[in-house]
UniProtKB/Swiss-Prot annotation:
GO cellular component: extracellular region; immunoglobulin complex; plasma membrane
Annotated Gene3D superfamilies: Immunoglobulins
Residue positions the entry lists as glycosylated: 145, 173, 219, 265, 371, 383, 394
Biological role: Immunoglobulins, also known as antibodies, are membrane-bound or secreted glycoproteins produced by B lymphocytes. In the recognition phase of humoral immunity, the membrane-bound immunoglobulins serve as receptors which, upon binding of a specific antigen, trigger the clonal expansion and differentiation of B lymphocytes into immunoglobulins-secreting plasma cells. Secreted immunoglobulins mediate the effector phase of humoral immunity, which results in the elimination of bound antigens.
Gene Ontology biological process: adaptive immune response
Protein name (database record): Immunoglobulin epsilon heavy chain
Organism listed in the record: Homo sapiens (Human)
Residue ranges of the region described as Constant (C) domain: 125-547
């Protein structure tokens, strides 16, 4: 029997390499050409190359030229494919195939493969996560005397394989029947069926879907059948502000009303992450045939003023309902705007002299005095601040007040407030700032020189990608032979959100021909609170190719 057996599925990072083997048996290895074909999600079959096992001659598809090498070891009846410089679009199902004996290299087509095997190779981050759906019958369609019932779990739209589907059946015994199919889009779908017997009517079941390549897990808990129900209305209300300018905790009240009585679960999220806090949840109240309940979340001013989004998430009958809230942008009288900036990581961790700045813009010139007053939420005294006024070309006035803060005070989470008053303002403007809360992640730094470009022979561009850091506060410097360059020498973008939960920035530095001909070294340095041990991560790059 003819068999072609490939090496197992693998996950590789972008830029890495992978070696695939295909061992043949059941025929004379040197009599038939061996080749590889791949199918990426949402695409058709694509020929990569073939090899003549007898002579070692190869033929490669143009788009893979230079990135693929095919070899063979006739003594082991094995062909090898080495794929280099992997990209995200290299994630695909790869098929190893053989030709009819002694076929011409001009008539290769996919239908000529007598035997073939498939295996999936994935570039890290290029996978698609499964969507998971419970499959149940309507309760009214299940006979009252039924001794067993079948329910299912559908995982669809994922790539690559595999997923593992398991069930939590409590004290009941069950049997499962998994089935996997490849959809027209190139993604996979799996259905797992569970048949249970016994006292199943009031039992809840959990379907656990684990996507092995991405190391993600999705759980769905549901009952054996679905009933008609009225879904809840979810609304968040919050306590009123203190008009005296004080900063008491705020109360977020989540009202869940108008739903058919049944089990309900309420969870609070902060920027999409489950909050580990003590909640006050009222007991369910009946409203005729419907029910209502509520959950209360208390937030400190530090958290509320951090501009984070808070979500009340309600799980009911296998469905999710939610409402979200965040601090509204402060309204400013007469177009006046006030901004409060946090200290830069460079000032905080390198210079050890952090400052925060209160900036007031678009003030109309008048004889009255603009007062900027600093305070701390702890009530402790503040340092002496410096003040600067500047008249703009449009006739408005800009006022800046800079306050030195203690490094330890800032790191430990002190909240600072700037209060702006003026005789012509109907009310004071209040701004607060504190250390960003939430998860921490150190930056990844990649520095490289761009290729020379025609017409730019007197210059060379160095680039620095800094990514996957949290929170977003970061400082970027360039060093030339270990001497820091002025900020005016380079351009750095503002932090932007990645598709995940982190941030990234891109920095660009132009160097002269004289600098790179001296074989000088340039360093891109990122200063961030999560970097260890000294809050800095740096990468060196030489624009001289011989270095």
């Amino acid at each position: 029997q003819v068999q072609l057996v490939q090496s197992g599925a693998e996950v590789r990072k972008p830029g890495a390499s992978v070696r695939v083997s295909c061992k043949a048996s059941g025929y004379t290895f040197i009599d038939s050409y061996v080749g590889w074909i791949r199918q990426a999600p949402g695409h058709g079959l694509e020929w990569i190359h073939w090899i003549n096992p007898n002579s070692g001659g190869t033929n490669y598809a143009p788009r893979f030229q230079g990135r693929v090498t095919m070899t063979r070891d006739a003594s082991f009846s094995t062909a090898y494919m080495d794929l280099r410089s992997l990209r995200s679009d290299d994630s695909a199902v790869f098929y190893c195939a053989k030709s009819d004996p002694f076929w011409s290299d001009y008539n290769f087509d996919y239908s000529s493969s007598e035997e073939g095997t498939e295996v999936t190779y994935t570039v890290s981050g290029a996978w698609t996560l499964p969507s998971v759906f419970p499959l149940t019958r309507c309760c009214k369609n299940i006979p009252s005397n039924a001794t067993s019932v079948t329910l299912g779990c559908l995982a669809t739209g994922y790539f690559p394989e595999p997923v593992m589907v398991t069930w939590d059946t409590g004290s009941l015994n069950g049997t499962t029947l998994p089935a996997t199919t490849l959809t027209l889009s190139g993604h996979y779908a799996t259905i797992s069926l569970l048949t249970v017997s016994g006292a199943w009517a009031k039992q809840m079941f959990t379907c656990r879907v684990a996507h092995t390549p991405s190391s993600t897990v999705d759980n769905k808990t549901f009952s054996v059948c679905s009933r008609d129900f009225t879904p809840p209305t979810v609304k968040i209300l919050q306590s009123s502000c203190d008009g005296l300018g004080h900063f008491p905790p705020t109360i977020q009240l989540c009202l869940v009303s108008g739903y058919t009585p049944g089990t309900i679960n309420i969870t609070w999220l902060e920027d999409g992450q489950v909050m580990d806090v003590d909640l006050s949840t009222a007991s369910t109240e009946s409203q005729g045939e419907l029910a209502s309940t509520e959950s209360q979340l208390t937030l400190s001013q530090k958290h509320w003023l951090s501009d984070r989004t808070y979500t009340c998430q309600v799980t009911y009958q296998g469905h999710t309902f939610q409402d979200s809230t965040k601090k509204c942008a402060d309204s400013n009288p007469r177009g006046v705007s006030a901004y409060l900036s946090r200290p830069s990581p460079f000032d905080l961790f390198i210079r050890k002299s952090p400052t925060i700045t209160c900036l007031v813009v678009d003030l109309a010139p008048s004889k009255g005095t603009v007062n900027l007053t600093w305070s701390r939420a702890s009530g402790k005294p503040v340092n002496h601040s410096t003040r600067k006024e500047e008249k703009q070309r449009n006739g408005t006035l800009t006022v800046t007040s800079t306050l030195p803060v203690g490094t330890r005070d800032w790191i430990e989470g002190e909240t600072y407030q700037c209060r702006v008053t003026h005789p012509h303002l109907p009310r004071a403007l209040m701004r607060s700032t504190t250390k960003t809360s939430g998860p921490r992640a150190a930056p990844e730094v990649y520095a490289f020189a761009t290729p020379e470009w025609p017409g730019s022979r007197d210059k060379r561009t160095l680039a620095c990608l800094i990514q996957n850091f949290m929170p977003e506060d970061i400082s970027v410097q360039w060093l030339h032979n270990e001497v820091q360059l002025p900020d005016a020498r380079h351009s750095t973008t503002q932090p932007r959100k990645t598709k995940g939960s982190g941030f990234f920035v891109f920095s660009r530095l132009e160097v002269t021909r004289a600098e790179w001909q001296e074989k000088d070294e340039f360093i891109c340095r990122a200063v961030h609170e999560a970097a260890s041990p000294s809050q800095t991560v740096q990468r060196a790059v030489s624009v001289n190719p011989g270095k």
